[in-house]
């Protein structure tokens, strides 16, 4: 170190490094600070010298950098913003000065920068923040800003995390399955229970500590669930196309599930209690058509038992094929069957049908019907 005036040089050894300090009255316009094999030039500032450096202990800690999210609470900070310790600056191995701030409520020392350091600027990588000692770049510090000292403030369902880089500090982080600031944590609404509501193709997103929303996949729509909350529901032909086979699926937002079926000849559209549509074999016919086509008798011969009501214009599901098939009409439409010549009644459990036993002319033109028609309808077994 060069200088026109006599200067007292103090050489101190600490943690394997050589620290050098010049008393305040001997500072030139610029001073050279030796840190190991590095010579750095720093601007002169007004300083207050200390004849003796304080004694302290350092606890070294090593960890990877973990920055807190916006939701998590930082208990104490190690930052480069220069707030609230604007009179403190940290000298790095790259030769730059950066601002340094202390933990909340801690006061930055105006006169102590560590052994060999004097005044407002530190001539080493040490700075004092009240009882806290922060060391860069080896990522070690002692004092107040540590999980050992601050971690008790975290919620019981949180863990304390140390970030030892500039800009870091100590913060609380809620454990897996919990959300919140870290000071307070509650059960994550997007746990397995929430993801199940969003469906296999949906994604659960936390809104706050008690509510969630879903982003839905293709063919799904966000709906309010009867039991509360939201979920993803399969809608439209993307989800129900196979239901309409062998017919055609048509997207239709006016229907509850976002589609409707267009069924081919010989099939009719059927809607379940869940508002799902499909094409089933058979056609919708009136009661008059049922009497004429299924039983070969006129509509006037069809009548209801005592205690029941109905009309020949009522519609029923008319099927072809298996005898004894069950339909979907109410049992109140209880028809009295009078099988015509060439037919005989066949009784099943709760079902009665008239089966054709030979070719029978349905009209006066001599046309013969060779199809076996079966009533797909439930009736009392007493018939």
Curated annotation (Swiss-Prot):
Prosegment location in residue numbers: 27-66
PROSITE patterns the record matches: EGF_3
Annotated region (Required for proper sorting to micronemes), positions in chain: 146-189, 190-236, 237-290
Signal peptide: 1-26
InterPro entries found in the cross-reference section: EGF-like_dom, EGF_dom
Glycan attachment residues as annotated in the record: 201
Protein name per the record: Micronemal protein 3
Phylogenetic placement of the source organism: Eukaryota, Sar, Alveolata, Apicomplexa, Conoidasida
């Amino acid at each position: 170190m060069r200088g026109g005036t006599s200067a007292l040089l103090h050489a101190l050894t600490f943690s394997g490094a050589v620290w050098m300090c010049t008393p305040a009255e001997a500072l030139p316009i610029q001073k050279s600070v030796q840190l190991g094999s590095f010579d750095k030039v720093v601007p002169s500032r007004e300083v207050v010298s200390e004849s003796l450096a304080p004694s302290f202990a350092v606890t070294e800690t090593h960890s990877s950098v973990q920055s807190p999210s916006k939701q998590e609470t930082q208990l104490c900070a190690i930052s480069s913003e220069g707030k609230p310790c604007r009179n403190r600056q940290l000298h790095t191995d790259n030769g730059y000065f950066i601002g340094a701030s202390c933990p909340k409520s801690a006061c930055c020392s105006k006169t102590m920068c560590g052994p060999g350091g004097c005044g407002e600027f530190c001539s080493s990588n040490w700075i004092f923040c009240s009882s806290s000692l922060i060391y860069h770049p080896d990522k070690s510090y002692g004092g107040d800003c540590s999980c050992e000292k601050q971690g008790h403030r975290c919620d019981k369902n949180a863990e304390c995390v140390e970030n030892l880089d500039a800009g870091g500090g100590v913060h609380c982080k809620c454990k897996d399955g919990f959300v919140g600031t870290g000071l307070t944590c509650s059960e994550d609404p997007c746990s397995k229970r929430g993801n199940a509501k969003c469906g296999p193709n949906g994604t659960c997103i936390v809104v706050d500590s008690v509510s969630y929303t879903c982003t839905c996949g293709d063919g799904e729509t966000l709906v309010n669930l009867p039991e509360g909350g939201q979920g993803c529901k399969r809608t439209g032909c993307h989800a129900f196309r196979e239901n309409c086979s062998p017919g055609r699926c048509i997207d239709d937002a006016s229907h509850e599930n976002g589609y409707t079926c267009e069924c081919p000849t010989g099939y009719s559209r059927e809607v379940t209690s869940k508002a799902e549509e499909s094409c089933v074999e058979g056609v919708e016919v009136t009661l008059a058509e049922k009497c004429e086509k299924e039983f070969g008798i006129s509509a006037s011969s069809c009548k209801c038992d005592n205690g029941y009501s109905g009309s020949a214009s009522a519609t029923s599901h008319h099927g072809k094929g298996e005898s004894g098939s069950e339909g979907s009409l109410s049992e109140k439409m209880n028809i009295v069957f009078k099988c015509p010549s060439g037919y005989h009644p066949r009784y099943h459990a709760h079902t009665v049908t008239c089966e054709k036993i030979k070719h029978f002319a349905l009209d006066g033109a001599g046309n013969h019907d060779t199809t076996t028609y079966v009533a797909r309808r439930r009736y009392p077994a007493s018939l």
